[in-house]
Structures are given as C-alpha cells and as structure tokens.
Amino acid sequence: MKSTKTVLIAVGLMLACGPAWSQAAPPAPAPARGTRVPQANWWSEAGGDAGGPTRIVWAAQKTPETPYTGPNKPIWHIADILKAHQGQARWEQKVLLNRDFDGRYVQMAPGDKTKCIFYADDRVFGWVYSGQVKMTIDGQEPKTLSKGWVFNVAPRLSYCMETVGTEPVVFYRTAPAGQVPSYPESETPTPVPGYKYVKLKINSTGGYDSFNVPFFNVDEYGASDRRGERFLYDGHTSSNLNIANNITELPPSTSWGHLHQNMQEVWLDVYGSVCALISGEGVVHGEYGDLINANEERWHRATSCPNTGKSIRMAMTPRSKEGQVHYFQTDQPPGN
C-alpha cells in the first residue's frame, strides 16, 4: 500500500508539472561571429591553426636544413643597411624574397614622389623607420606617416608616396613577389622587360574591413596596454603585430619553439628588442628596424630579449586566414 501511494504522488506531480516539462529547452545562444565551434567530426571543420585535437604526426624536415639564398639571411641589421648606403640620396635594399613576398628597405630623398601604382589581387604593406612620408591611397584621405606607422594598401587600390619635410624617409615595404604593377590611366607606366602595357578597363576594386585598416600607429600601440589588434589579414597575406612581454632570461635551449612547412616566417622588429632562436643559427638579437627570417622547416622561437621590456615583431606569413600548421616538439609544451 505504501508503494502504491508513492506512485500516485509521483504521477500527480508529473501531471501538475506536465506543461513545463513538455516545453522545449531554450535554444543555446549563437556563438559570436568568427568563433570556431568544436565539432564531433573535427576533420570537417573550417581550416585553422588551433582548436583541433592534439595529434602526433610525421612531418618532413629538410636535411641539411633549408639554406638561405638570394637576399634572405637570418637577420638584416638596419644599422648595416644604412651604413652600406651612406651618402646616397635615395636607394633600395632587397632584404626578403620568397614565393609570396618581395621585401625591401627604401630611402626617398626630400622632394621625391613615386608614381601611383596598384597590384591586381595582392596587398602592399610596410612600416616607417624614420622621416615622414605622405601616403595617398584610393578612397582614403592622404595621410602623413612618421616613425612607427604601418600602412596597408588593399588590392586594386592605387597608392603614391611623397617625402614630407627636409629629411629623407626610410621605410620597409613588402610587395607581392614576381608581380608587375598596374597603373591608373593618368600615369605613364615604367617599362618592364618582357612586358608591354596595354590600356584596358576593370570594374573590380578593393577596400577595408575590421581586420584590415590603411594606417596603424605601432609606436602608440606599443606604449599602451592594448593587445590583439590587427591591421592586415586576408587569405593570402597576414602581418600580425606579435607582442612579447619582458622576460628576465631566455627559455631553456631544449625549447625550440615551432616550425612551418613550405613557408618562411619573417619578423620585422617594430618595438623593443627581439631575440629569436633559429635552428642552425642560434639566437639572433634584433633591434628596432632589424629583419629576422626563419627559413622553411627551421625551428624558431621569438621572445623579447631579457630585461629589455616589451617587444613587438611584425610577423609576415602567407595563408594565415585558412590556417597554417605549427609543428611542436612532442616532449615540450607548445613554443612561441
């Protein structure tokens, strides 16, 4: 009899609460735009360099390690570049050339002005080391950039540069490798061997979004507490402003960082001092304006140099939006 009474009480409670129990649970809030949601079958997720399960894999690494060729070397010191061109009013020094990027340091003399050019499908970007330059980009108000500013010219937007003031301007610039520029109708194209310029029409244009801005003040960014901001990020080109905190000593020599396959990782020191371990080269010490290059399949680990404060390195890599694999040591925590 006791058990029957218990059952009846339970049934009565179910009937009383029935309408509430039968209602569907409220839908889960939608993830923020751009957030990657883990899936049970992770292999079908959109590309990315993080968020999947840890896997142990076999990765191909060149032996001997990938050599540096052409203008590429572990580190270019801006002091050496300036010394090599001492006494010249204007010059260009190629410091990077790979499948994706053609990187150069450039000095323009007072009064110099470039022709307006654009590239069909890729960006031009750079950073001002010293002096002042007026940047004119289609659709943007002309802006005078001084030390510490970066610029990002979207594809199909023509741009011109003009020195401002009585001092030369020195800047770093990355253009798409192996590509010949186009010109607006108002310009006279500079001849290029093996090509002829023909007058055509286009109806494509470029622009900016939350990940891409035409101008960004890195010196101001470095002096602030802000983090995680981008000025350039698309399917072909990525240039992150990687912040590293002050440290008192370098990580142990057993921590190698990570490596990439089939691509270099290049850093321009745009704030503070950067110390980078590159396999086969040891630790290279970068100062403001130096360019550091970790060649394909070489281990690399970048930090601030000990006891020098915060640093920012402008990382230049391809394919970041679709994801780029960071290969880590199996017996160490993930390196930077």
Please name every model-derived segment:
Residues 1-8:
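Bacterial N-terminal signal peptides that target proteins for export
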Residues 9-18:
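Bacterial N-terminal signal peptides
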Residues 24-102, 115, 181-244, 257, ...:
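A short, N-terminal "cap"/entry segment at the start of jelly-roll beta-barrel domains
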Residues 107-108, 118-135, 247-250, 259-276, ...:
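Short, conserved beta-strand element in jelly-roll/cupin
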Residues 114-116, 135-136, 153, 158-166, ...:
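Short beta-strand His + acidic residue motifs that chelate non-heme Fe in jelly-roll/DSBH
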Residues 125, 139-156, 280-298:
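Short acidic-glycine-tyrosine-enriched beta hairpin
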Residues 152, 166-183, 293, 308-327:
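A short hydrophobic beta-strand segment most commonly corresponding to one strand
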Residues 228-305, 310-312:
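Structured core of small recognition/catalytic domains
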